[in-house]
Every structure is written in structure tokens, then in C-alpha cells.
Curated annotation (Swiss-Prot):
Subunit structure: Homotetramer composed of two homodimers linked non covalently. Interacts with M, S and E proteins. Also interacts with the accessory protein 7a.
Topological domain ranges for the Cytoplasmic compartment: 56-78, 126-274
Effect the entry attributes to changing T34A: Complete loss of O-glycosylation
Domain called CoV 3a-like viroporin CD: residue spans: 145-237
Result of altering C117A: No effect on polymerization
Record-annotated site: Involved in polymerization: C133
Residues listed as glycosylation sites in the UniProt record: S27, T28, T32, T34
Transmembrane segments: 35-55, 79-99, 105-125
Protein name, as recorded: ORF3a protein
Residue numbers on the Extracellular membrane side: 1-34, 100-104
Amino acid sequence: MDLFMRFFTLGSITAQPVKIDNASPASTVHATATIPLQASLPFGWLVIGVAFLAVFQSATKIIALNKRWQLALYKGFQFICNLLLLFVTIYSHLLLVAAGMEAQFLYLYALIYFLQCINACRIIMRCWLCWKCKSKNPLLYDANYFVCWHTHNYDYCIPYNSVTDTIVVTEGDGISTPKLKEDYQIGGYSEDRHSGVKDYVVVHGYFTEVYYQLESTQITTDTGIENATFFIFNKLVKDPPNVQIHTIDGSSGVANPAMDPIYDEPTTTTSVPL
């Protein structure tokens, strides 16, 4: 117990000899004991500090975070708050164990530990999703699904809300305001353009992997909308190894999803026939 107390305590722990007063050989029922434990850090101030951190953490959710460094800073702060909460939980639990008052709070601590385990499992699952998507975006965004495709230059991973039958990827040419940069946009999320699209994209979730095939490309002459190109993907019902693709010259064939993209830099003259 002393080892754990010294490990999980800020400051120092003073272990004092047990002192029992008012005890007599005839009557030991009314004896009073002194807890042989004294922490140099005021526990109340630690709890108040973590409470303020939790309030500040909740307040930051109302602030618009658009840039990646802002999202990374917020997620890092959130992770530190969770670690502090776990520290306070273990610290207070060990103090109650040393005081012999653990039984009254056992169910409360069991609930807290259960919630902490869920949070830890969620972090592990997000890391696994990062590995599947080959990107750090699952750690930055809270979306449950991500639209991914991979080229020679870049691994794209854009947050997505749910599994749908159709996905529309909007390519901005960097001319329209207020966005003066080339990017790909899906449902309010965007990622800078580093290379072109592929003939298929994959929606990754915790236990989901759905393939979508490129069906058509709509340019300004098709839609009347300037400075944007739309790539329309439809959900595949076939097995992933047998993806039917449409090449630029109109021929069709069977390709493996691991193949290189047919084109890497779509232009305003690029059109994929249905």
C-alpha cells in the first residue's frame, strides 16, 4: 500500500505509527485510532483544480476550431484533463482505503473506473482507426466514419457522418471565396488538395469498411457552378477484390482496389462516362 501511495501522490507521504487511545484490556470497543497517513498535498485543492479544468474543457467546445493545430491543441488538453481525473480518482481511492472507508464509496468508484475504461477503449479504437486510414485525422475529429483514398503523394482521410448510398466529393479550385485554396470537401469537412482522386474510395469505421465506386464527374459545364468539380461515388455491393471501374476512354474492366489511380490530376476536361 505504501508503494502505491508514494507513486500516486504529489508531494510526500508521511507514514506515522498507529496510535490507539482510551483502550483498556476490559473494553476495546470504544478505542479510537489515528489514521497513520498524512499527505503533504491538500486533496481539496487538487479536486478544485481538476473541476476548473473540466469546466474550461467544456467551455472550449463552443469555440470554433478550424485549423489542425487548434484541434491538436484541444485534443491534447482533453487528454491531459482525462489523465488528471484518473489521477485524482486513484489518489482519493487509496486515501479512503488507508482510512478504512472504502466500502461506502465502492460502487461510486466502480462506476468511475468503468467510465474510465470505456474512455481508454475509445482512445485505443481511435488509434486503430488511424492505422486503418493511414492518417492522424481520427484522433483530431470526433466523426465515426472517414472517407479515405490513397495516392502516391498523399493519404486522404476526410470525416464523414454515416454510411450512405452516395458520396459527393467537391473539389475547390482555390478561386472561390472565402476559401482561396485547393481542397476536397465532404459534408462540411475539407482537406487540402495534394493530388487527384481515385476511381474508388473507402469509408472506414470502427467495424466498417465500405467501398464506393466513382460513377461520374460533373464540371462547370454540367452544373453551372463555377470553381468546383463534383465527384460522385456510389456504394458497391460487390466484393472489394472485384471492383468494376470505368476508365477515361470508356472501356471497363476488373481491377484490384490496391491498384494505382488511373489519373492523379483531374482537370476541367476530365469526365468519366457512366
